[in-house]
């Protein structure tokens, strides 16, 4: 079984609907009462990490699979009714407030730390947020962390425009080390050896034209992500970190809606966690 001490961190990558893999991992951790003194999540990793921190086993799976099938909160339907491809009003207000209540009390009473990552649209840099008591601000932060560029409107935290933290820090391993945690368990949503295209990502001239540093960050996104993957694999080989990831390329897209594919990926996450942690 995994040996956790006061210097051990849990790092959660995002990946949109690929995050159901992480849901499986976190449910395994909760089933075995495995807790970390510090965790950090990006985008879907932030969403699922919140349910882990409030000890709500199964909440991530229910939100990402069962309620997706019922409410169809991704795709053309929310695009027509709202301002993006994802119904954020449903996800970040109706779900935690009424449909799938979030246990803010349990989260506030959890002595362990949890940070969420966003991208500052003005500076083009990562922001790291730690909030346990202001319920409105918690939602603002996790919503911003999960606001995919192009697919969602900008979100605001303390009046500052923010987008998905994965733009600049998809795998915040170095952040965990900077915070003093030199033992990390990293949960990825891509298989070993995966790399994005090395070409710079073109950003249409009419998009985010008032945010030049954000545009630079978007163009360099693939390069930064590949560098983070290389660091993860190098440190894994050196025995510095433990990595839980899909064993083979997955067929689930960032905005996947297939219940079967999502359920299979959730189960894969649970089994991968069991295999890695139990050896």
Specify the residue positions occupied by each region the protein language model found.
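Patatin-like phospholipase
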Residues: 1-42, 50-279
